[in-house]
Amino acid sequence: MDMDSAHLDSSLLTLAFRLIKAAQTAAPSVLADLLAEGAPAWFQDDDLGWSCLHYAAERKEPECLEVLLQGGAVWNAVDKWGRTAGEICLSLGDEEGWSIIRNEGIRSEDKTSAGDNLVFLKSKLTWDVGKDGKERVLDADGNGVMMGWEEPLSYCIVVEHVKRLTEEHPKAELGAEGMSILNVGFGLGIVDRLFQECDPKPSHHTIIEAHPQVLEYIHKKGVHLLPNVRILQGRWQDWLLDGEKVGDVLSGTPDGMGFDAIFVDTFAEGYEDLKAFFEVIPDILNADNGRFSFWNGLGATNPTIYAVSSSLAELHLEDVGLQVEWHDVLIPESMREEVWKGVRRRYWDLPGYRLPIAKMSLI
């Protein structure tokens, strides 16, 4: 018996097992009655780690899923193999059931966040070289902050970000003046190096970075000495939520009218922080041809949770007047497995990456 079962009194435990059984065969009305009696919809059995929602998903009965979700079933509960009920629907080709679970996730997760950026900024980082010879940064707990694997992997993710942000932009054409770039979160500097390798080079390149050791690394590598590069020390909130400082940030852009491309990837900030960043984009992105993208890694260890996070981001970008176009990037399994050796916490475990490119909506 697991810890959740041990903390249920006998009457609730009986109701929990009745609900589990009913979810496999009974009509939606029976499920509703059990929930009305107080059956715990969050309960998961010992054998498979399945909840009532998992069993209902196996039946391909949309109404059962709706009743259970309305009764408190947890949309993102995972079984012993890390699968949500959404993955059960996907494996059975049940698009309707999967959409019901995904949409519930979007509704319920609107106010969630993860990580603690302020704690991270005070933590000690370690620069390490993996067996592949690539440099990586680990935090004090051994979590990957910025991995050297992103360099080989960049040809299917990071390079793709830069490509999508710059391709066919009028200022990125040969002979043009170059784009005005803002990158928030330096890491190992891979994205910034790729921007610098563009032809023409950026006419202006601002980097916002807050971690003291990363700032030391920037100066050690001489990034601050590159032509047209400006380093702003501090959190993006310090610069972009301060009315006076926003003017300073925009001072390097043509006529102060906004950046041509903005990319953000800040480790240990949760979705609430990303959503707050969305809200300042209309003030700092060039309205005519500006493009915005972000590292889309929230929930990236589970396909259903990842889909919910991506859909939620799209909705919130639309709320502030941006339209999003998604680009799917394939990640080879061999590469996904190799890069996590020696790292405690994975933050990517999916075969594909959804790359967002957002532009101001045309009115």
Curated annotation (Swiss-Prot):
Keywords: ANK repeat, Cytoplasm, Methyltransferase, Nucleus, Repeat, S-adenosyl-L-methionine, Transferase. Disulfide bonds: none annotated. SUPFAM superfamilies: Ankyrin repeat, S-adenosyl-L-methionine-dependent methyltransferases. S-adenosyl-L-methionine binds at F120, F186, G187, L188, G189, I190, V191, E209, A210, H211, W236, Q237, D265. It is found in: Cytoplasm; Nucleus. It is an enzyme of class 2 (transferase). Its main location: cytoplasm. One of its GO terms (cellular component) is nucleus. This is Protein arginine N-methyltransferase 2.
